[in-house]
């Protein structure tokens, strides 16, 4: 599902990040404590009254070296470009400032709904001071203390009320994929080459985000695809377009909307920290993954080049051991014909279901090879396992005590399941549950 976007804006020190964390709460989860698997705190998923939304802390995107008003303008511009709903945070302690008025004028000219959150209203006596904020012309101010959690519910109610109506999903048989990576890795060239290679009739479809143009196409076998454009990547003249955090945010939004993610690496430049960061987010989100090394034609190669690259990738991306690696050239079209079929194969892995009887045979065989562990004289007992969902495939293993299921044994079972059923290109999740 494509989530609507809520952006938090406001001058420094009004409590934007505190409000962000209060709304996001514990919903930001690190699935595995593995080096390179991180989630950027400027982007999270919020939920209230059974409605989910993407949450952006624009303050996290600031260039701290930029002039004060440039930072403010920068935030407001991102919010206007990206958000369905804008939460404008001001400080009840300091009252209306020139910077607040500056942002209010920018936001007033947009057609986006704006919620005026007066933060740092830490005691009832201060509520009388919020009426000054009506002068900003943005409607009713919502008093809040994000530190204490006061008023957050009212702000969330207002957010939900102003979110756009939920949109229907694309045809379930459509495979949604995106190409992500640092600037200048050749994403645009790859997109154009893929479309040309498939000789498809591609039609631009207005995306659910403001500036996204997705490309819907059908291959020669009748399989439908939706190629998700990382919105705004091609826009020019934006001061913030080349900042890494903004690029990360764009990539994260594309990942959220994708079934399969193609991580594009520049063969000339090698693997960078950005690549691992984005790959970690896609892994956590349970997306299918392909590691695409582009500009392969520009490297001088010998008989060991491919093996060296594969070894380095496996070392740098240890959490992506399931992801296939493909070396391509958008310029010469080398191996591009293999990409659509690989995307399709990984989508099938993401949607694969294993009958419980067959799954439990594999689990029992695994236990015979490597008996369950013991702790303080008590042995882990596995009663049965079942698959509970797809995208990614998720399995629940019912046991006598959850605490006895050591991470290493869970990983062993995952490897046995992968050996039996392949699951190429997709993470799989195993969850231990105590049998009731």
Swiss-Prot record:
GTP 2 binds at residues 181-188, 229-233, 294-297. Residues 4-167, 175-351 form the EngA-type G domain. InterPro entries: G_ENGA, GTP-bd, GTPase_Der, KH_dom-like, KH_dom-like_a/b, P-loop_NTPase, Small_GTP-bd. One of its GO terms (molecular function) is ribosome binding. It holds the Pfam family KH_dom-like. It comes from the Bacteria. GTP 1 binds at residues 10-17, 57-61, 119-122. GO terms for biological process: ribosome biogenesis. The keyword Chaperone does not apply. Residues 352-436 form the KH-like domain. Associates with the 50S ribosomal subunit. Belongs to the TRAFAC class TrmE-Era-EngA-EngB-Septin-like GTPase superfamily. EngA (Der) GTPase family. HAMAP family: GTPase_Der. This is GTPase Der. The gene is der.
């Amino acid at each position: 599902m494509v989530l609507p976007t809520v952006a938090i804006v406001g001058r420094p020190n009004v409590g934007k990040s505190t409000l962000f964390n209060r709304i996001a709460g514990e919903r930001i989860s690190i699935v595995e404590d593995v080096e390179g698997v991180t989630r950027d705190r400027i982007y999270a998923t919020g939920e209230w009254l059974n409605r989910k939304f993407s949450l952006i802390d624009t303050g996290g995107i600031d260039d701290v070296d930029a002039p004060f008003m440039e930072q403010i303008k920068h935030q407001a511009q991102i919010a206007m470009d990206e958000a369905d709903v804008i939460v404008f945070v001001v400080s009840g302690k300091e009252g209306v400032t020139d910077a607040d008025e500056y942002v209010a004028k920018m936001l007033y000219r947009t057609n986006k709904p704006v919620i005026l959150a007066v933060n740092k209203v830490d005691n009832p006596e201060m509520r009388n001071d919020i009426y000054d904020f009506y002068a900003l012309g943005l409607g009713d101010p919502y008093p809040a203390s994000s530190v204490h959690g006061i008023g957050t519910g009212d702000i969330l109610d207002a957010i939900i009320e102003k979110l756009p109506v939920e949109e229907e999903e694309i045809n379930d048989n459509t495979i949604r994929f995106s190409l992500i990576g640092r600037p200048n890795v050749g994403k645009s060239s790859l997109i154009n080459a893929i479309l040309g290679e498939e000789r498809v009739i591609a039609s631009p479809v207005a995306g659910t985000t403001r500036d996204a143009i997705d490309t819907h196409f059908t291959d020669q076998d009748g399989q439908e695809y939706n190629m998700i454009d990382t919105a705004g990547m091609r826009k020019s003249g934006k001061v913030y377009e080349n900042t890494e955090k903004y690029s990360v945010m764009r990539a994260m939004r594309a990942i959220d909307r994708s079934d399969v993610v193609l991580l594009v690496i520049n063969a000339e430049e090698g693997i960078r920290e950005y690549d691992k960061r984005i790959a970690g987010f896609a892994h956590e989100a349970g997306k299918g993954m392909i590691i695409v090394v582009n500009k392969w034609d520009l490297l001088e190669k010998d008989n060991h080049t491919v093996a060296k690259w594969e070894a380095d990738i496996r070392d740098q991306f240890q959490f992506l051991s399931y992801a296939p690696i493909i070396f391509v050239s958008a310029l010469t079209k080398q191996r591009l014909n293999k990409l659509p079929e690989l995307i399709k194969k990984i989508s099938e892995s993401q949607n694969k279901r294993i009958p419980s009887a067959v799954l439990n045979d594999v689990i029992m065989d695994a236990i015979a090879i490597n008996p369950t562990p013991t702790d303080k004289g008590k042995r882990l007992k596995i009663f049965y396992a079942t698959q509970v969902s797809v995208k990614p495939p998720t399995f629940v293993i019912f046991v006598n005590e959850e605490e006895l299921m050591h991470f290493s044994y869970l990983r062993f079972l995952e490897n046995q399941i992968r050996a039996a059923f392949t699951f190429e290109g997709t993470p799989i999740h195993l969850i231990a549950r105590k049998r009731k």
